[in-house]
Amino acid sequence: MLTPIAYGLAIVLIALFAFIGLRFLVVPRPAAAGYGVAAKEDGDPAYLTIKGQRDFTLSLVGAALLAFSNAHAVGWYMLVVAIIPLTDTLIVLRHGGTKAVAFGIHFATAVAVLISAALMFAV
């Protein structure tokens, strides 16, 4: 019973990582606004593209681990990946974003990723 839940949550989260990466690649400025810190109109869009390609590539690593590795490897991946939304929480708070976005999106995502890691270690 626990295995489908563990893998299901991991699949959903990895798909979310891919979506975020693709969004930053396709529509970078709206993606930045959704992130919680709006991009400056005169700012260099290369940094948004960098974020997009890194998030998307990281999702491919997770997908490869899901497909070709074991649950513990995916658990370690999720544990390490949880650092990203945790630091995103701090970035949003330090750069003028709202607490609602910082905690409601980024911190909540970190909690979900940590739960996923725990579930993957448990199966």
Predicted regions and their residues:
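Helix-coil boundary and interhelical linker segments in multi-pass alpha-helical membrane proteins
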Residues: M1-L9, A64-V74, A117-V123
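Residues within membrane-spanning alpha-helices of integral membrane proteins
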Residues: Y7-F17, G52-D55, G75-P85, A110
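Small-residue-rich segments of transmembrane alpha-helices in multi-pass membrane proteins
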Residues: D42, I105-M120
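Hydrophobic alpha-helical transmembrane segments
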Residues: M1-Y7, G21-V26, Y47-L60
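Core segments of alpha-helical transmembrane spans in multipass integral membrane proteins
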Residues: G43-A67, V80-I83, T87
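N-terminal signal-anchor/start-transfer transmembrane helix
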Residues: A10-A32
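Membrane-helix boundary connector in multi-pass membrane proteins
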Residues: F68-S69, T87-F103, F121-V123
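Cytosolic, membrane-interface loops and tails of multi-pass inner-membrane proteins
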Residues: V26-P45
